[in-house]
C-alpha cells in the first residue's frame, strides 16, 4: 500500500477514547523494546513517527495510528517488563485483554518476537492466548539483520518450535534497517483489511 498520510489519532488510556470508526485495525504486540515502533515506522515510510523508546515499558497507552484512513495500526503496551507497578500492569492487562477480545474493528494481531533469541515464556503465553481466542495472528521475527544469514533457518525453526506455531500462523523475518520483510507484512495486513 502506498502510504503518504499517517496520523496518531489518540493515545488511549480507556476504551471510551478508542476511535469511533469502522476502519479495520491491526494490533501490534510484543515484549518491550522488541521493535514495534521500528516496524511501524518502516511500514508507514517514516523515520521517527512512532516513537522508539530507550526505556522499556514506557508505552502505557494504546496508540492508534490512522494510515491513509484505510487501516489503524494499534501499538499495544509492551509485555514482560517489570518497571511498571503491579496495579498498573493489571489495569493495562485488563484493558488490552478487552481490546483484543471485544473490539469489532480488530482484524488481526502482529506478534513481534526477537529473532536473535528463543521466544520468552511471555511470548509463548501471548501466542497461546491469541490462538485460544482465535485471533488471526502474524508472527514477525525482528532484528534479523543481527543474525548471520546462515543461521536464519535455525532461528525460524526455534521460533516455530518454542511457540508451537500452528500451520495457519505465518512467520516473517524482519529487519528495520534493511526493510526486509516489509512487503510480506503489508501483504498480510492488506489481506486482513478486507475481512470482517
UniProtKB/Swiss-Prot annotation:
Sequence positions that bind GTP: 30-37, 57-61, 75-78, 142-145, 174-176
Family: Belongs to the TRAFAC class TrmE-Era-EngA-EngB-Septin-like GTPase superfamily. EngB GTPase family.
The UniProt record lists the keyword Hydrolase: no
PANTHER family for this protein: ENGB-TYPE G DOMAIN-CONTAINING PROTEIN, MSS1/TRME-RELATED GTP-BINDING PROTEIN
Domain of life of the native organism: Bacteria
Alphabetical list of Pfam families matching this protein: MMR_HSR1
Stored NCBIfam families: GTPase_YsxC (TIGR03598), small_GTP (TIGR00231)
Binding site for Mg(2+): 37, 59
Cofactor(s) required for function per UniProt: Mg(2+)
GO CC terms: cytosol
GO molecular function, a single term: GTP binding
Keyword Iron applies: no
Keywords: Cell cycle, Cell division, GTP-binding, Magnesium, Metal-binding, Nucleotide-binding, Septation
Family annotation (InterPro entries): G_ENGB_dom, GTP-bd, GTP-bd_ribosome_bio_YsxC, P-loop_NTPase, Small_GTP-bd
Name assigned to this protein: Probable GTP-binding protein EngB
Domain EngB-type G residues, every copy: 22-195
Taxonomic lineage from the root: Bacteria, Bacillati, Bacillota, Bacilli, Lactobacillales
Function: Necessary for normal cell division and for the maintenance of normal septation.
Gene Ontology annotations of biological process type: division septum assembly
Organism: Limosilactobacillus reuteri (strain DSM 20016)
Amino acid at each position: 500500500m502506498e502510504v503518504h498520510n499517517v496520523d496518531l489519532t489518540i493515545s488511549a488510556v480507556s476504551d471510551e477514547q478508542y476511535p469511533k470508526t469502522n476502519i479495520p485495525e491491526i494490533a501490534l504486540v510484543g515484549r518491550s523494546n522488541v521493535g514495534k515502533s521500528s516496524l511501524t515506522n518502516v511500514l508507514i515510510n517514516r523515520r521517527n513517527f512512532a516513537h522508539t523508546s530507550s526505556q522499556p515499558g514506557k508505552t502505557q497507552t494504546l496508540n492508534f495510528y490512522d494510515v491513509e484512513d484505510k487501516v489503524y495500526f494499534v501499538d499495544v503496551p509492551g509485555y514482560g517488563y517489570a518497571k511498571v507497578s503491579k496495579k498498573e500492569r493489571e489495569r493495562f492487562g485488563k484493558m488490552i485483554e478487552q481490546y483484543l477480545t471485544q473490539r469489532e474493528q480488530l482484524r488481526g494481531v502482529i506478534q513481534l518476537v526477537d529473532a536473535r533469541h528463543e521466544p520468552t515464556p511471555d511470548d509463548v503465553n501471548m501466542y497461546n492466548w491469541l490462538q485460544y481466542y482465535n485471533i488471526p495472528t502474524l508472527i514477525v521475527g525482528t532484528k534479523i539483520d543481527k543474525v548471520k544469514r546462515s543461521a536464519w533457518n535455525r532461528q525460524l525453526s526455534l521460533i516455530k518450535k518454542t511457540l508451537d506455531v500452528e500451520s495457519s500462523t505465518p512467520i516473517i523475518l524482519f529487519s528495520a534497517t534493511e526493510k526486509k520483510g516489509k512487503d510480506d507484512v503489508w501483504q498480510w495486513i492488506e489481506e486482513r483489511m478486507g475481512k470482517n
